Amino acid sequence: MSLLREAEKCIANQRSHAALNAFITTVQHLGPLREQVRDAELRRESGRSKSEVDGRLIAFKDNICTRDFPTTCASGILAKFTSPFNATVVEQLSEAGAIVAGKTNLDEFGMGSHCLNSCFGPVKNQRQCQEGRILSAGGSSGGSAVSVATDQCYAALGTDTGGSVRLPAAYTGTVGFKPSYGLVSRWGVVAYANSLDTVGILAKNASTARDVFRIVNRHDPRDPTNLSPRSRSRIASHLQQPALLSRMTSSLRIGVPIEYNISELSPSVRRAWALSIAFLREQGHTIHPVSLPTTKLALSAYYVLAPAEASSNLAKYDGIRYGSRCNSPDSGGQPESYLYAKTRGDGFGLEVKRRILLGAFSLSADAINNYFIQAQRVRRLVQHDFNAVFRAEQPISPSRQKGDTELKSKQAEVDVLICPTAPSCPPQLADLVETDSIFSSLNAYTNDVFTVPASLAGLPAASVPVRVNCRDEGSSDADLAGIQIIGQYGDDELVLKVSESLEGKIF
């Protein structure tokens, strides 16, 4: 298919699938877009193509700054904000010839698991259950996932803090890849939790995700959390060791975390996991059970750390420095509250306000030692658990602590881990809306139980779709389950390689 025809198809799909609410903003003037595509077509015909994405439409989650489109974070408080600059990842992909397809819908500021917490309305999954009711698209990058699943763009970028790229990928039948923390620049990405936020990629297949990843996997001096050239060189040298280099062509040692086999796992997802393991064994890989004992504490630690960072990051949205301004006084009527309390109260959604309060509490003098500090300790234990089971050492800080060595001596060293992405197939949106808001939020938090550990450790992880029979969960088209591949820090290419071998398999 020609690039122009592919672009026209994406634009047509944006119109025909508008009811899914995947996009907040799309290209309004198509003439310049078509000219860009024609130029890319000429470069391709003459052998001067800039990259694999040259002339292709890439969508960006609406918390990634773009100069030519508003950046709202799906929040009323940023409803009128347009960034004066492009995020680094937008610049990198534009330099590679990619064309911005638009800005995708999300949970407000990335806080949510079902794309319900958006001031622009919920994102709807393109798949339907037997009764014709709409399914959750996952969150918070649900708009990016649906836009890819319905061919409204070639690929899309999202952000993954605790699973926000991988969970929507599992629900929509796409590939969602979260790179190692620090490889991809966060400059120009609106912060939720700085130590966890990672720009992720959503695509139809792992090969496309790899193409996009290689473009954005570069040093950016403007982002202090981005890996330096020295650290990148250290990772590259580490991966050139013969024992590690051979993994790209030989059989692998694949670990199965026993703690992920929870009672709440749905029968269809459990079956997909088991059959995926069996398939990899048939391909010549060896399977080894491993233990990640701190897994049971990871989710609780995440929901202390992420809101704590969010409460700090979102303090600037007060109607004075950033954000829309409410000019009416609050209920107290005090002059000093005119541009602050009312603005934040009206501008933020319920879930964002809930997390700001939770974060402020965990950082308070009375709670910081019992909550925030303890959560940081749990995070370190989660990292130690992963270091203990992987054959490759952590290349940035390779010296193992005593606990790592003791754990490692008791179990097999593996190259990657395989586990479910989500404990169940996507729920119905109506059920999520009708449930009491507090209990609905708590249930949504538990959807991250399998994705949060890799986020806390900063590891690369990908969700790939496999086909199974999910009709036991009441869906005529819910035959896709997400299987997650997790690798050691810096093993991004290996994670994508294993993902590519597994994606789209029918069991």
UniProtKB/Swiss-Prot annotation:
Any single Pfam family the record assigns to this protein: Amidase
GO molecular function: ATP binding; glutaminyl-tRNA synthase (glutamine-hydrolyzing) activity
GO biological process: glutaminyl-tRNAGln biosynthesis via transamidation; mitochondrial translation
Reactions listed under catalytic activity: L-glutamyl-tRNA(Gln) + L-glutamine + ATP + H2O = L-glutaminyl-tRNA(Gln) + L-glutamate + ADP + phosphate + H(+)
Keyword annotations: ATP-binding, Ligase, Mitochondrion, Nucleotide-binding, Protein biosynthesis
GO cellular component: glutamyl-tRNA(Gln) amidotransferase complex; mitochondrion
Domain of life, source organism: Eukaryota
Class of this enzyme: ligase
Cell compartments where the protein resides: Mitochondrion
Active-site residues, as the UniProt record annotates them: 61 (charge relay system), 140 (charge relay system), 164 (acyl-ester intermediate)
Assigned EC number: 6.3.5.7
Primary localisation category: mitochondrion
Free-text function comment from the UniProt entry: Allows the formation of correctly charged Gln-tRNA(Gln) through the transamidation of misacylated Glu-tRNA(Gln) in the mitochondria. The reaction takes place in the presence of glutamine and ATP through an activated gamma-phospho-Glu-tRNA(Gln).
SUBUNIT field: Subunit of the heterotrimeric GatCAB amidotransferase (AdT) complex, composed of A, B and C subunits.
Entry similarity comment: Belongs to the amidase family. GatA subfamily.
Protein name: Glutamyl-tRNA(Gln) amidotransferase subunit A, mitochondrial
Organism lineage: Eukaryota, Fungi, Dikarya, Ascomycota, Pezizomycotina
